[in-house]
Amino acid sequence: MSRRAKKDDFLRHYTVSDPRTHPKGYTEYKVTAQFISKKDPEDIKEVVVWKRYSDFRKLHGDLAYTHRNLFRRLEEFPAFPRAQVFGRFEASVIEERRKGAEDLLRFTVPIPALNNSPQLKEFFRGGEVTRPSEVSRDLQILPPPLIPTPPSDEARLLQPLPAERRGQEELEVPVDPLPSSPAQEALDLLFCCDSTEEASSSPARGPLSEAELALFDPYSKEESTGPSPTHTSELAAMEVQSKRLDQEPWEPGGREEEEAEDGDPAPAYLGQATELITQALRNEKAGAYAAALQGYQEGVHILLQGVSGDPSPTRREGVKKKAAEYLKRAETLHAHLP
């Protein structure tokens, strides 16, 4: 089963409720994630964790970074309440933070790159995957209360000495159990992000997935079936191609098709993007990966802004394909950055 199919298995619903004061003095909130099967609406899985304001603020920063790299302009990323020292225990502030956290989680629902991100899965780490019906059943079937009975004389003789009892208590100090493997697997099934992607990148700066790149390149699935060239040969090919971008149109049909369609020269945004991307290719070849990454991002940003107003349908298609190629190239640079 493909990753795309896995992502579409569940409908998601998030709630943030029941604020309470932790014994250490800060406020924490109950976060409930419900995963409703599309095949069987009665099949509902639930994950509950307790989080504080700083946890939500970190998640907000991580997801905002990912959202910016998606170049989505149709929706505005939700703001989050600012940190404050005074008044943070007031009911109005607690409610504002609760609602801000809930809005953040619900914003991720229609965006696969966010709701299946490693950052969101890490946020729910430690929560046990349960079914609401099982929880209610467990609450109804409670064991009978334990009634203490006075120990018999025989039991009193078998009791350990105080020193032995102290030693036994020291050995029986409870420790927090490590997350079990089945629990980890259950969480992984709900958040279908690639584990190798998590290991190769930091949680806050994960690379974009193939599904996200497909937003810009409708032919990405067809092209991905062939063997990929080596890093060196691909760089050389892209550099030669970029040198011709200001001379040839960014469309499959060539210059004759462009001139026959509208008779106008290539728009200015293509020249600006060409200059940035050409320099980015040179920086990458020289090993200046940070500068190259910035150049790719700025170049792709100009392309996607300009293509929305481009009157040529064929050129728009070509620009989207080029933007996807250079965006994918930018993502490979994450492996070289410290």
Swiss-Prot record:
Residues 134-155, 240-270 are annotated as: Disordered. Residues 1-131 form the PX domain. It holds the Pfam family MIT. The keyword Protein transport applies. May be involved in several stages of intracellular trafficking. Overexpression of SNX15 disrupts the normal trafficking of proteins from the plasma membrane to recycling endosomes or the TGN. The modification Omega-N-methylarginine is found at residue 106. This is Sorting nexin-15. GO terms for biological process: protein transport. The gene is Snx15. Keywords: Cytoplasm, Cytoplasmic vesicle, Lipid-binding, Membrane, Methylation, Phosphoprotein, Protein transport, Transport. Residues 142-151 have a biased composition (Pro residues). GO terms for cellular component: cytoplasmic vesicle membrane. A 1,2-diacyl-sn-glycero-3-phospho-(1D-myo-inositol-3-phosphate) binds at residues 52, 54, 88, 97. It is a peripheral membrane protein. It comes from Rattus norvegicus. GO terms for molecular function: phosphatidylinositol binding. The modification Phosphoserine is found at residues 202, 228. Belongs to the sorting nexin family.
